[in-house]
Amino acid sequence: MSNEDLKLKVAKEAVKLVKDGMVIGLGTGSTAALFIRELGNRIREEELTVFGIPTSFEAKMLAMQYEIPLVTLDEYDVDIAFDGADEVEETTLFLIKGGGGCHTQEKIVDYNANEFVVLVDESKLVKKLGEKFPIPVEVIPSAYRVVIRALSEMGGEAVIRLGDRKRGPVITDNGNMIIDVFMNIDDAIELEKEINNIPGVVENGIFTKVDKVLVGTKKGVKTLKK
């Protein structure tokens, strides 16, 4: 069974949590994209009244494609946010997100939801946060040099994320740059705050406020809770 099959299993299970009348946070990434598709199918088939709040331009375009009505945080609170992750620490359910460069908008929606549910396949589970992925840090462009210096002084190895199909740095939906920092994570809660306290940092990709993780495995979907 491929990772894509496991992601689809999780997406189908997650859609069952959606009830008529809910406002849903629509995450970004491959698993979140499958969830958006399955949610659109369920809304159409069951004639549900469900609204979505997208966490990125990509999520917005997918929601429009699958005819999910969209609203904003200015108008509504979020009942449940569904989002993916680059890696999940099994014992704490702390996450690293932001491989797609959308972690600022994701965190705004996810942290302000009544419930934050993470959707992953089993390959995303790690024993220690930071095992596979760097911490993405969104930075105001004029501050990139001083932010890199501050992260280096904290013991990190910081590099500007460059575009795959363009010259120069990746630019986020907010018009900012991404710095990827490789560093030891002993206290994720404290490090999340510490990085955000650096002047010029918009937001980082450590997520510590998670309610539930749905994990796609070859034996089925398992639920992890704190």
Swiss-Prot record:
GO terms for molecular function: ribose-5-phosphate isomerase activity. Substrate binds at T28, G29, S30, T31, D83, G84, A85, D86, K97, G98, G99, G100, K124. Gene3D superfamilies: 3.30.70.260, 3.40.50.1360. One of its GO terms (cellular component) is cytosol. One of its GO terms (biological process) is pentose-phosphate shunt, non-oxidative branch. HAMAP family: Rib_5P_isom_A (MF_00170). Keywords: Carbohydrate metabolism, Isomerase. Homotetramer. The active site is at E106 (proton acceptor). The lineage of its organism: Archaea, Methanobacteriati, Methanobacteriota, Methanomada group, Methanococci. Its EC number is 5.3.1.6. It catalyses: aldehydo-D-ribose 5-phosphate = D-ribulose 5-phosphate. Pathway: Carbohydrate biosynthesis; D-ribose 5-phosphate biosynthesis. This is Ribose-5-phosphate isomerase A. Catalyzes the reversible conversion of ribose-5-phosphate to ribulose 5-phosphate. Belongs to the ribose 5-phosphate isomerase family. It comes from the Archaea.
